[in-house]
Structures are given as C-alpha cells and as structure tokens.
C-alpha cells in the first residue's frame, strides 16, 4: 500500500522516523526498483542553517519545498550526484527528509547495472549499491526529472511495509548529527539523522 498524503504531514522529525523501514519505489521502463529506507536526515526549514530553505530562501530549486507535503525534492550536489528528499509539513513550511540509505529489494539486477554497468559484482560492491544519497539515486534512476513529482504517483512513491515484515523489530533506531553540513554553525550538532543501528547499508556508523 502506498503511503497516503497524511503520512507526510505533521512534525518533520516524526515523519523522518516513520520513513525508516518503509520502501522507496521507482518504476523505470516498467521495472520496479526499490529499497527499504534505513537512514534519513530531517531538515526543518527557515530556522535550520543546514536546510536549503534556511531563512525562508525561496528559489526555483527550492520552490517545491514550499508546496504540499508528500512530493519529491531532488537536487544535485557537486554537479553530479542526485539527492532525493520527501517534502513534509504544511504548505508554506519548507521542510523535508533526505533519504540517505536503502537496503535494495526489487530490481536488483537493474540496480547493479545502474551502479556498476554489470551484474557480477563483489560483496563489497553489493554493500555499496545504495548506502548513500547519491548512490541510491543512481541505483533507482532518480534524477532532476523527479523533482516536484507527487509521491502518490504510480512510478515514484513510498510503499508502507506491513508490520509483520517491518525490520524495526530487528534494529534499534539511533539519532545523531547530520553528515557533511560543516557550514551550518550550531545546526551541525542537531541530532536529526536517524538510522537503524548496525544495519549493513547505513552510510556512516
């Protein structure tokens, strides 16, 4: 079942934790690629110096952040790596959750090809398929084309995992500082990164 629009409303930190264990799905050329979300970071808008929307900055790039929750915010870093975010909070409140790492589930062969141009890969390469925001976007074929797409779409959405299959019973959720935001002054220390402790696909222990 797809996560309904109401799933993305409410406090961004709570939505971030709710996303853990759910499945990010992207249909590419009719083939389902997906992974279980195992690591996220919350960004809380105008008051968060690490957020693109800090101070209420409104640009062509960040416009989607000011819109309805439950949409995709995709951007480039270093001019080459895509990052996928889920927009949260009410319209006009530019907050979101960065998906940092996934455990691959569906379309594994397509994911391998997208990452390594081959399907015969080592165990180390397998662990590196989706253990970072740029890696998971490459693996799932998420690009700037997906910016602003509703997560109610058939091709890009969050699939809710039934409780009996949910990995939250196997892993403890841990909170800590976000990664690579050295510019963000006091916001560097906010414990707004959430991940499954000990999960092999988490990007940084």
UniProtKB/Swiss-Prot annotation:
Keywords: DNA damage, DNA repair, Hydrolase
Statement: the UniProt record of this protein carries the keyword DNA repair: yes
GO terms under biological process: base-excision repair
Matches recorded under Gene3D superfamilies: Methylpurine-DNA glycosylase (MPG) (3.10.300.10)
Enzyme class label: hydrolase
E.C. designation(s): 3.2.2.-
TM regions (residue ranges): none
Domain of life: Bacteria
GO molecular function terms noted in the UniProt entry: alkylbase DNA N-glycosylase activity; DNA binding
Pfam families, per the entry: Pur_DNA_glyco
Family designation: Belongs to the DNA glycosylase MPG family.
Protein name: Putative 3-methyladenine DNA glycosylase
Annotated source species: Bacillus cereus (strain Q1)
Lineage of the organism: Bacteria, Bacillati, Bacillota, Bacilli, Bacillales
């Amino acid at each position: 079942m797809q996560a309904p629009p109401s799933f993305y409303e409410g406090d961004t930190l709570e939505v971030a934790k709710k996303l853990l264990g759910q499945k990010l799905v992207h249909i590419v050329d009719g083939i389902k690629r997906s992974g279980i979300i195992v690591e996220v970071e919350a960004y809380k808008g105008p008051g968060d110096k690490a957020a693109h929307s800090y101070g209420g900055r409104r640009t062509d790039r960040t416009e989607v952040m000011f819109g309805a929750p439950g949409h995709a915010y995709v951007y480039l870093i270093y001019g080459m790596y895509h990052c996928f975010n889920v927009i949260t909070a009410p319209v006009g409140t530019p907050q979101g959750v960065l998906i940092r790492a996934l455990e691959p589930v569906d379309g594994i062969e397509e994911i391998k090809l997208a990452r390594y141009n081959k399907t015969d890969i080592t165990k180390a390469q397998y662990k590196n398929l989706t253990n970072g925001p740029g890696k998971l976007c490459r693996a799932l074929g998420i690009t700037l084309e997906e910016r602003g797409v509703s997560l109610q779409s058939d091709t890009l959405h969050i699939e809710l995992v039934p409780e009996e299959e949910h990995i939250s019973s196997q892993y403890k959720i841990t909170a800590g500082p976000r990664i690579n935001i050295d510019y963000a002054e006091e916001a560097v220390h906010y414990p707004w990164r959430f991940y499954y402790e000990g999960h092999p696909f988490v990007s940084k222990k």
